[in-house]
From Swiss-Prot:
Cellular component terms (Gene Ontology): cytoplasm
Enzyme Commission number(s): 6.1.1.23
Organism: Symbiobacterium thermophilum (strain DSM 24528 / JCM 14929 / IAM 14863 / T)
Protein name: Aspartate--tRNA(Asp/Asn) ligase
Compartmental location: Cytoplasm
Reactions this protein catalyses: tRNA(Asx) + L-aspartate + ATP = L-aspartyl-tRNA(Asx) + AMP + diphosphate
Record function comment: Aspartyl-tRNA synthetase with relaxed tRNA specificity since it is able to aspartylate not only its cognate tRNA(Asp) but also tRNA(Asn). Reaction proceeds in two steps: L-aspartate is first activated by ATP to form Asp-AMP and then transferred to the acceptor end of tRNA(Asp/Asn).
PROSITE patterns (UniProt xref): AA_TRNA_LIGASE_II
Chain positions recorded as L-aspartate binding sites: E176, R222, H450, R497
Length: 593
């Protein structure tokens, strides 16, 4: 029987006609001479009725064999349900199909969990039986949304003159940052390919090639410890443009993101997006990816603290640190136990403690430190944080990086507790002017904040070549880089690139590469720059993360068809797995475990 309509797409126009539907049995109910089957496909479900008086005894006996998740083809007459039988909870709840023919296309074992959205089952079971998990409507909605996003991306870039160009999956290992996944070469014994962490160099070479506008929805690989928003293999929306400056890239990406929201969600997002410098973001929010759906900004009270009688505050400022606070509105009634919990929370970010002022509704004040302050000092601190009766003011005193990390995380924690991070609300932000370099204490050298091909900020270019520059001077150099942040999550990052060999050589030098090392790893790129490279820049968006946020999910595993676990394993296929000794011999390698 050939399908004539999808289960979720029956309409009034088809009432009275014979239709054929295919799908899986969601539920079967036996009422004596009537059998009701809810048949499901990816569009929804529809009720099928087997009435022994209408369909005959033979067909009815066949319907009695049907169980959950059987795959069926059903032909019948579409009718309206009686008013008392209407189900208002599903789009097709006014209709039912009175069965005339049935074909069991495939029987099914009893599944290890119910195929339904409100599922309470361990994720390891879901991943082991992923093909069953993906039958659930919410998982199918996630993948349909992912398709809509990628279609909107491709349509947009095609309309704006971009070429979708594939770059190699087997490439050269240039370890800088995360570990590479290595692939041994059978025909070149002792040598290895690497799976790409990013197509960065190849897309820059596309610009040197004169292709001008490149885009690729590309798989990337990083051998790193996983989190809720990380996978060993992931997908990027990768973009590069020639003859552009920063604002050209940002404007184009704003249009693309707005198009995705419009086409995939039916949501209009205002452009241009807000911009903050890295320094502003860290000072005001304690994070380079702040969630701007709520305020609760960090307020600096270091100048008041410097002259106060509270030794913790005064000592921190004298040691080159700072004192900052946030106002948790309406939390003035927090108990000492609750405040102690917050103190333990900030200690996980290396803060030594948490000071507080609780302003009671009746004007009373509870505090861990105001007894050491004058009334004027206390009043000034409360004024700066815009404290009102019922508020809880929370303070951290330490070095700037610790204050930012601890208070920034506490701000998000309090935002969650107070319900300020509203789902369904989207706040987009560009963070610009990142540092170009950061000092790595373990390796005793500078590393690139983004990557080695990021161009310095035009205003700081002369500082890159300054003879005898101190570590502090080099750390203060800004990058011509930018990140797009959505609801406190980094959605993508990019930069204007270096396109001249002398500057790229200098960048490698600052990162501790000898000329020989730079030539061995990146000689082909350096040589390409000598044949006329245009100014260029680009960006890469994490597609998995983007779809996760649009879908309102907490993990990218929910928007990837077949994801890995937190230990980078595939529970369904049992990958990674051991291989036969013969395979290792052919590759000229052996394991040591």
């Amino acid at each position: 029987m050939k399908r004539t309509v999808y289960c979720g797409e029956v309409t009034d126009a088809l009432v009275g006609q014979e239709v054929t539907v295919n799908g899986w049995v969601q539920r079967r109910r036996d009422h004596g001479s009537l059998i009701f089957v809810d048949l499901r496909d990816r569009t929804g479900l529809v009720q099928v009725v087997f009435d022994v008086e209408e369909c005959g005894a033979d067909l009815f006996r066949k319907a009695e064999q049907v169980r959950s998740e059987y795959v069926l083809a059903v032909r019948g007459r579409l009718v309206h349900r009686t008013p008392e039988a209407v189900n208002p909870n599903i789009p097709t709840g006014r209709f039912e199909i009175r069965a005339l023919d049935l074909r069991i296309l495939s029987p099914a074992k009893t599944p290890p969990f119910y195929i339904q959205d409100d599922l309470d089952v361990d994720e390891t079971v879901r991943l082991k039986y992923r093909y069953l998990d993906l039958r659930r409507p919410e998982m199918q909605r996630n993948l349909i949304l992912r398709h809509r996003v990628t279609k909107a991306v491709r349509d947009f870039f095609d309309e704006h003159g971009f070429l979708e160009i594939e770059t190699p999956m087997l490439t050269k290992s240039t370890p800088e940052g995360a570990r590479d996944y290595l692939v041994p070469s059978r025909v070149n014994p002792g040598k290895f390919y690497a799976l790409p962490q990013s197509p960065q160099i190849f897309k820059q070479l596309c610009m040197v090639s004169g292709l001008e506008r490149y885009v690729q929805i590309v798989r990337c690989f990083r051998d790193e410890d996983l989190r809720a928003d990380r996978q060993p293999e992931f997908t990027q929306i990768d973009v590069e443009m020639s003859f552009v400056e920063r604002d050209d890239v940002l404007s184009m990406m704003e249009q693309m993101v707005a198009r995705v929201f419009r086409d995939a969600l039916g949501v209009e997002v205002p452009t241009p997006f807000k911009r903050l410098t890295y320094a502003e973001a860290m000072a005001r929010y304690g994070s380079d990816k702040p969630d701007l759906r709520f305020g609760m900004e960090l307020v600096d009270v270091s100048d008041v603290a410097a002259g106060c009688g509270f030794g913790v505050f005064k000592g921190a400022v004298e040691a080159g640190g700072q004192v900052k606070g946030i106002n948790a509105k309406g939390c003035g009634g927090y108990s000492r136990k609750q405040i102690d919990e917050l103190t333990e929370f900030v200690k996980t970010y290396k803060a030594k403690g948490l000071a507080y002022i609780a302003l009671g509704e009746g004007g009373e004040v509870r505090s861990s430190f105001t007894k050491f302050l004058t009334e004027a000092e206390t009043a000034e601190i409360v004024r700066r944080l815009e404290g009102e009766p019922g508020d809880l003011l929370l303070f951290v005193a330490d070095q700037p990086d610790v204050v930012a990390a601890a208070l920034g995380a506490l701000r998000v924690e309090m935002g969650n507790r107070l319900g300020l991070r509203k789902p369904g609300e989207f706040n987009l932000l560009w963070v610009i002017d990142f540092p170009l370099l950061e000092w790595d204490e373990e390796e005793n050298r500078f590393v690139a904040v983004h990557h080695p091909f990021t161009s310095p900020h035009p205003e700081d270019l002369d500082k890159v070549f300054k003879e005898g520059a101190t570590r502090e001077e080099l750390a203060a150099i800004r990058a011509n880089a930018y990140d797009l942040v959505l609801n406190g999550v980094e959605l993508g990052g990019g930069s204007i690139r270096i396109h001249q060999r002398p500057l790229q050589n200098r960048m490698f030098e600052l990162l501790g590469f000898t000329p020989e090392e730079a030539q061995a790893k990146f000689g082909f790129l350096l040589e390409a720059f000598e044949y006329g490279a245009p100014p260029h820049g680009g960006i890469a968006f994490g597609l998995d993360r983007f779809v996760m946020l649009l879908a309102g999910r907490q993990s990218i595993r929910d928007v990837i068809a077949f994801p890995k676990t937190a230990k980078a394993t595939d529970l369904m296929t049992d990958a990674p797995s051991e291989v036969a000794p013969k395979q290792l011999q052919e590759l000229h390698i052996r394991t040591t475990v």
